[in-house]
């Protein structure tokens, strides 16, 4: 018996290797025909919604396809994973194989034709294998130009040419030759090909045609001048937020509501631009009312955190800045050089004193310069508020007689209304570009205008002036320090909204910020009514990665946001994400502190608040509540609704069910049923979600560690982050 088994093992297994394209077609045949081949190659779970009604809710599959290969020699089933990677500069092909034993895994094959067999027969005997046919000849496939669209209801791929789209994802490099029928070599390199001097001219041309392959994709042109890629515009200026390079002739394999995924792994966001911006680009002049008052065209976007419209309007064009001139000059110098002009000669205001505080955390966003600015702003705002109470007019003595540039000089005129908050309106302002303006710009712009978002902060008659002053100062200082961070030669984060200036006019304070023309995440989800407020999983993953990078930047510099929600997440049309609204942010560590300050009490919006905030008198780490909020934001993007209204067992039945199910089964049904483009990404994401939604803060993962998990590492993001 032993001898017979050894003989069976030594006998060559003659079987026809099924190509992946054939396996894909077999998915649409009756189930009986799928197991007819000795090797059963199965796509998991690339199925059309029309043929697989049970899995109609699955989202489209993008790049990674797992194949289960039933080998008669080895049992149990071996798992092969073919993963699509983004093409880096200099690589001629973007496809690689990863996973256990990927280098020896079967690849795409086909039978050779009679004409090709004649070429092989003309070769000398020593160039032909005694037991195998010729290795690796294949014709170039014809590539379809159709786009594989997605079902708007469930995101599944449905196209007559979906076989080509899926087959292209599984091909090896076009520069390699694949083995055929049990070859002893995995890949036949060019040096092993038959010499041409043994073939006549006719066969030379035939062999050349048989072994010719489509031209490789042009290498991507990455712009690494900053932390992320840039898109070239006709005027040779660039918006630094584009995921794909121009000129890459690649096929779109997934398209859903403007979001496109290409066969090289890249993707493209196409978020709707504001209607008023399009009108301004066509016009020759700005629609400005007399005396600079706001004309009434409304934006075609929503910034939902800025809720109501106020009746009283104010003239802001003559507003003057509250920032000291020294601060402005230092900021401009830091923007150019990355360091303060007087770093070597500057002395601390408390230097020489016994209680001089030593800087132990140089990366902290709140340092000595910010402390000086806080004191200066607080003093000027207090004086202005006193004048406002007495004369109902903001005219501080420091501003009278100064010939500093006005609001109109720096930021132009109001041209639209964005929304309104608790303390006033938010307006869109624009000014014409001039010769002094040079890229890169820190806000949205086109060939004619530069745009700014202007937030009005006006005290109410019954408001606490001390609280109002603290809110204005903290919101501006935190946003300004994060968006203009140049300490230790580091650049600002691309996912933090720029805050430029704070001014005052006759009746209010004015904060000037970067304008994001695509609105906020809340408006984006509400606008996707056909998809029930859901985003494609790949698009949501990209946004999640950008959000985590922005939050990590804040945490690395001693600040927690504490109010992360879709209303506070803004976008550019090409998918660049910006975190805004630092009014409730917490400074948990300054430049003079080693320890992290804990806090207590409820901060933020209830659906996004972590459960430990509802415990009376309990102190918590503000960084961990940001991580919880990021998880809730992601689930909202995927499901189109909240998991619960409030993370409290006593107040919300949905959260109580989540708590009980996790206690009883150690899993949550909603997380288990979430679909992704393939099982590997779905599993990695599910593991990360369980790490995020831990009601015990000590068990919850941090934002930095979450970015290091396999889910985020395998996520293709349209920004390129500096690894340092």
From Swiss-Prot:
ATP binds at residues 418-426, 455. GO terms for biological process: intracellular monoatomic cation homeostasis. GO terms for cellular component: cytosol. Keywords: ATP-binding, Cytoplasm, Kinase, Nucleotide-binding, Phosphoprotein, Serine/threonine-protein kinase, Transferase. Its main location: cytoplasm. One of its GO terms (molecular function) is ATP binding. Coiled coil: none annotated. Its EC number is 2.7.11.1. The keyword Secreted does not apply. The modification Phosphoserine is found at residues 19, 232, 238, 241. This is Probable serine/threonine-protein kinase KKQ8. It comes from Saccharomyces cerevisiae (strain YJM789) (Baker's yeast).
């Amino acid at each position: 018996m032993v001898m017979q088994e050894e003989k069976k093992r030594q006998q060559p297994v003659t079987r026809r290797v099924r190509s992946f394209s054939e396996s894909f077609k077999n998915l649409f045949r009756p189930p009986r025909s799928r197991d007819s081949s000795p090797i059963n190659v199965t796509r998991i779970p690339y199925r059309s919604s029309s043929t697989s009604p049970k899995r109609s809710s699955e989202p489209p599959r993008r790049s990674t396809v797992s194949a289960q290969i039933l080998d008669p020699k080895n049992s149990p089933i071996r798992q092969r994973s073919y993963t699509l990677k983004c093409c880096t500069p200099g690589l001629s092909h973007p496809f690689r194989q990863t996973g256990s034993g990927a280098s020896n895994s079967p690849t795409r094959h086909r039978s050779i034709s009679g004409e090709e067999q004649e070429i092989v027969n003309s070769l000398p005997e020593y160039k032909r294998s005694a037991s195998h046919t010729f290795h690796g000849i294949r014709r170039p496939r014809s590539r379809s130009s159709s786009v594989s669209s997605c079902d708007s209801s469930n995101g599944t791929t449905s196209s007559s040419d979906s076989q080509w789209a899926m087959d292209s994802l599984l091909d090896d490099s076009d520069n390699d030759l694949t083995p055929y029928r049990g070859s002893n070599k995995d890949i036949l390199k060019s040096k092993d090909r038959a010499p041409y001097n043994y073939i006549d001219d006719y066969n030379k041309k035939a062999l050349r045609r048989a072994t010719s392959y489509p031209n490789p994709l042009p290498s991507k042109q990455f712009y690494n001048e900053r932390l992320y890629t840039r898109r070239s515009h006709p005027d040779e200026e660039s918006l630094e937020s584009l995921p794909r390079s121009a000129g890459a002739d690649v096929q779109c394999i997934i398209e859903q509501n403007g979001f496109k995924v290409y066969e090289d792994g890249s993707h493209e966001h196409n978020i709707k631009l504001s209607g008023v911006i399009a009108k301004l680009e066509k016009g020759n002049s700005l629609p400005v009312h007399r005396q600079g008052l706001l004309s009434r065209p409304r934006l075609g976007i929503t910034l939902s955190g800025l809720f109501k419209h106020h009746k009283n309007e104010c003239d802001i064009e003559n507003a003057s800045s509250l920032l000291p001139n020294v601060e402005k000059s230092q900021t401009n110098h830091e923007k150019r050089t990355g360091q303060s002009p007087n770093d070597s000669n500057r002395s601390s205001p408390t230097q020489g004193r016994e209680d001089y505080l030593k800087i132990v955390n140089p990366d902290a966003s709140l340092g000595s310069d910010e402390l000086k600015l806080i004191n200066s702003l607080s003093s000027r705002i207090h004086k202005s508020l006193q004048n406002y109470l007495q004369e109902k007019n903001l005219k501080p003595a420091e501003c009278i007689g100064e010939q500093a540039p006005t609001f109109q000089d720096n930021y132009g005129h109001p041209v639209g209304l964005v929304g309104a908050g608790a303390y006033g309106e938010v307006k869109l302002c624009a000014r014409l570009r001039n010769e002094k303006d040079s890229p890169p710009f820190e806000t949205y712009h086109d060939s004619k205008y530069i745009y700014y978002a202007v937030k009005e902060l006006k005290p109410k008659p019954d408001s606490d002036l001390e609280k109002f002053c603290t809110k204005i100062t903290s919101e501006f200082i935190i946003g300004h320090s994060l968006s203009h961070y140049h300490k230790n030669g580091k650049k600002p984060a691309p996912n933090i909204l720029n805050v430029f200036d704070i001014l005052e006019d006759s009746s209010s304070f004015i904060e000037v910020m970067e304008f994001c023309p695509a609105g906020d995440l809340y408006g984006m989800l509400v606008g996707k009514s056909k998809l029930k407020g859901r985003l494609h999983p790949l698009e949501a993953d990209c946004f999640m990665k950008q959000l985590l990078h922005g939050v990590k930047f804040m945490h690395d510099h001693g600040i927690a946001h504490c109010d992360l929600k879709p209303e506070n997440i803004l976008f550019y049309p090409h998918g660049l994400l910006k975190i805004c609204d630092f009014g409730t942010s917490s400074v948990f560590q300054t430049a003079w502190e080693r320890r992290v300050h804990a806090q207590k009490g409820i901060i933020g919006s209830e659906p996004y608040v972590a459960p430990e905030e509802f415990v009376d008198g309990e102190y918590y780490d503000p960084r961990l509540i940001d991580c919880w909020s990021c998880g809730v934001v992601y689930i909202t993007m995927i499901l189109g609704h909240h998991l619960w209204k409030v993370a409290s067992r006593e107040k919300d039945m949905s959260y109580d069910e989540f708590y009980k199910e996790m206690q009883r089964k150690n899993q949550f049904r909603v997380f288990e049923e979430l679909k992704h483009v393939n099982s590997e990404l779905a599993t990695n994401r599910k593991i990360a979600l369980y790490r995020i939604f831990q009601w015990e803060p000590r068990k919850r993962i941090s934002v930095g560690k979450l970015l290091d998990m396999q889910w985020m590492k395998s996520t293709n993001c349209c920004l390129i982050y500096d690894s340092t």
